[in-house]
Curated annotation (Swiss-Prot):
Regions that span the bilayer: 12-32
PROSITE patterns listed in its UniProt record: THIOREDOXIN_1, THIOREDOXIN_2
Disulfide partners: C82-C85
Native organism taxonomy: Bacteria, Pseudomonadati, Pseudomonadota, Gammaproteobacteria, Pasteurellales
Keyword ATP-binding among UniProt keywords: no
Keyword Transmembrane: yes
Main function: Could be involved in disulfide bond formation. Could catalyzes a late, reductive step in the assembly of periplasmic NrfA c-type cytochrome, probably the reduction of disulfide bonds of the apocytochrome c to allow covalent linkage with the heme. Possible subunit of a heme lyase.
Protein source organism: Pasteurella multocida (strain Pm70)
GO MF annotation list: disulfide oxidoreductase activity
Record domain Thioredoxin: where: 42-179
Name of the protein this chain belongs to: Probable thiol:disulfide interchange protein DsbE-2
Cytoplasmic side: 1-11
Cellular component, GO annotation: outer membrane-bounded periplasmic space; plasma membrane
Length: 188
C-alpha cells in the first residue's frame, strides 16, 4: 500500500469522531424539543402491567394488580428524594378526599419514604414499594413525579409527567375523566 493511500485512509478516520459527535448532538437537540409532559405512554389503552411488589406500609405483604382499586383511580409515581413530589404533595392530600390514589414509591429508600409520609401525610390508599424501579420500568416511567389515570378495569387512560397541580388537574385530568365518565354512561 502506498504512503499516499495510507494518508488518505487516516484522513477519513480523523473526521469520523466529528461526524459521530454531530449525529449525537442532532439527536439530543431533537429529543430536547419534545415536551415530556406531552409524550404519550405506549401503555395508554392497555392494562397496568402484571406486578408483585412489596407494600411500603406493610412490608410483609406483596401487592399485585388485583389489589388496585376497582374504580377509577390515580397512580402517582413519587420519591422522597424528589423536590417536585414534595411540591405536589399538598394537592394530592386534597385530591385524596374525593378519589382513590395509589402511590408508587420509585427508586427510594423505604425509611425515607415512610418518614416523608409521616411528616407530610399519606394521601395514598395503597403504597407500592418499587425501590428497584421494576414496575416503573414496565410502566415506561421517565422520572418522578408522574401520574396515571387508570379506569375501573385497570386500563391506563392517561399519563402526565410532572407535578400535579390544581391547574394541571383542571386542564389535563378533568377532560380525560369526563371522557371516561361518558364512556361508562354508554356502557350502563
Amino acid at each position: 500500500m502506498s504512503m499516499l493511500h495510507q494518508q488518505k485512509r487516516k484522513n477519513h478516520f480523523v473526521f469520523l469522531p466529528l461526524v459521530i459527535l454531530l449525529a449525537v448532538c442532532a439527536l439530543l437537540f431533537i429529543g430536547l424539543q419534545q415536551d415530556p409532559q406531552k409524550i404519550a405512554s405506549a401503555l395508554i389503552g392497555k392494562p397496568v402491567p402484571t406486578f408483585s411488589q412489596a407494600d411500603l406500609l406493610r412490608t410483609e405483604r406483596r401487592v399485585t394488580q388485583q389489589d388496585l382499586p376497582q374504580q377509577t383511580f390515580l397512580l402517582n409515581v413519587w420519591g422522597s428524594w424528589c423536590a417536585y413530589c414534595k411540591k405536589e404533595h399538598p394537592f394530592l392530600m386534597q385530591l385524596a378526599k374525593s378519589m382513590p390514589i395509589v402511590g408508587l414509591n420509585y427508586r427510594d429508600n423505604p425509611q425515607n419514604a415512610l418518614a416523608m409520609l409521616n411528616q407530610l401525610g399519606n394521601p395514598f390508599q395503597l403504597v407500592i414499594n418499587d425501590s428497584r424501579g421494576e414496575l416503573a420500568l414496565n410502566l415506561g416511567v421517565d422520572g418522578a413525579p408522574e401520574t396515571y389515570l387508570i379506569d375501573q378495569y385497570g386500563v391506563i387512560r392517561y399519563r402526565y409527567s410532572g407535578p400535579l397541580t390544581p391547574e394541571v388537574w383542571q386542564e389535563m385530568f378533568i377532560p380525560e375523566w369526563q371522557k371516561l365518565e361518558a364512556e361508562n354512561a354508554k356502557v350502563r
